[in-house]
Amino acid sequence: MDETRLDKIEIKELEVFANHGVYPEENVLGQKFVISATLFTRTRLAGLTDELSASINYGEVSHMITDLTRKHTYKLLESLAENLAEMLLCSLSGLEKITLKIEKPWAPVGLPLKTVSVEITRKWHTAYIAFGSNMGDKKMYIDNGIRGLAETKGCRIEAISDYLITEPYGVTDQDEFLNGVLKMRTLLTPGELLVRLHQLEQAANRERIIHWGPRTLDLDILFYDQEIIDMPDLHIPHIDLHTRDFVLVPMNQIAPYLRHPVLNQTISQLLDSLLNKSENTAK
């Protein structure tokens, strides 16, 4: 997503009386909160057609913010902000990103101040996940894993490649694999997404005994936006994806023109290079 092409709709200083705070008195007596929201979307179609349905209705958004703020009680402004952002991003079609500022002008600090506030920015991210299985009912394990991911709050599956039967990689003395790739939108951070994938693997009774060994379900993050991450337990883009045909073939099916942020080549180019290398090796 090219954020430079996004337009903005702003809601400034919406006042809501609610009961958030650490102190019990705040939860009982309540106080004023002032909420501002910047909605990042595309207004081009609405501008051309003059149709409200082609845009985001800021009146409805103001009521949604007011309703959640009034009906729920949180100790922290941070919690209120996170829940508001998630609710709006998951509910509003066309909302790609949001900045929320929540002010608490009557905060019980005991000192003269104008206000205290928390400001966050959250957005949809695009991730590509490789999936595979070579034990038991392979398709069932994969289908259940994808379903679990689709049912995760803040996750949407956008495309799934064909399931491919492939030869085992690394340790070759094992059953054939069923492999593929999916494209998703998510509000989860890379670390949170990794944790969720591990939970789904564990739900399929995945055991990590032999490196590259048999597994009921394997879920790996290939790409997360155009981010480059190198941590002990997480490498994005996946460090070996350009050497694996069982990743590049399904990736080429759903995202041939996606560009690798490190190698600066498209998936289609990486696949062509790998196939040419394999042909030359075979000669």
Residue spans for each PLM region:
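Flexible, gly/pro- and Lys/Arg-enriched active-site loops
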Residues: 42, 47, 124-126, 169-178, ...
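Short, surface-exposed acidic-centric catalytic microdomains
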Residues: 44-59, 151-189
